Amino acid sequence: KWAVEQMNNAINASGHLGISPMASFSGALLFHTFYPWPQRPTGLVEEGFKELAKRWKPILNHADSKGVDICYEIHPGEDLHDGVTFERFLKATNNHSRAKILYDPSHFVLQQLDYLQFIDFYKDYIKMFHVKDAEFNPTGKAGVYGGYLEWKDRPGRFRSPGDGQVDFKSIFSKLSQYGFEGWAVLEWECCIKSPEQGAKEGAKFITDHIIEVTEKSFDDFAGAEIDKEQIKKILGL
């Protein structure tokens, strides 16, 4: 009850401020069972997402009344941690119009998910964007699960923007191509660089990647008025 009240308070505040997208985590009823051994009981996943949707739908309805989108950060440790789980949740909420996505490519690098194709699949749902870098360098000793290593020693670790493996040029291009109108928000976590240097470099990094979207085609100068007779001639009609 307390958690629902806090979510609704945050929604109210967002509505008063005229801010439509609001970030959140989904919570986790199922994540501790994500590895399929021991075998999951039949129906567990379906029931888990049904319950998750049951808890979220009143909040999503309240968000709708305030004109606010709930943007779930697709994040490890949460039941919504990739595209498949987001789709499961969306279906369980009857495709609620206020269920959206906070896109953070760093989490996809660490689970080896195609973060560029993710944009193609979910462009209509992405309403928030974290500019956060990461790298994944597996060894013969550790991989995605990390072996309980400290951050600086993990194969998958977060880095300051520009120091990792995320192709931000392609991300900014895709988001611009699809008409993303939200903020590019610096979320900084790095186990090597200082936060002061990261903040200074990060602001410039984002500025340098912002694309001023063109309002015309580059070859418009060669365009011409429609000439039906010329068209027929070209087609041999």
Where do the protein language model's features map onto the residues?
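Histidine-acidic metal/acid-base catalytic patches
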Residues: 20, 57, 65, 82-103, ...
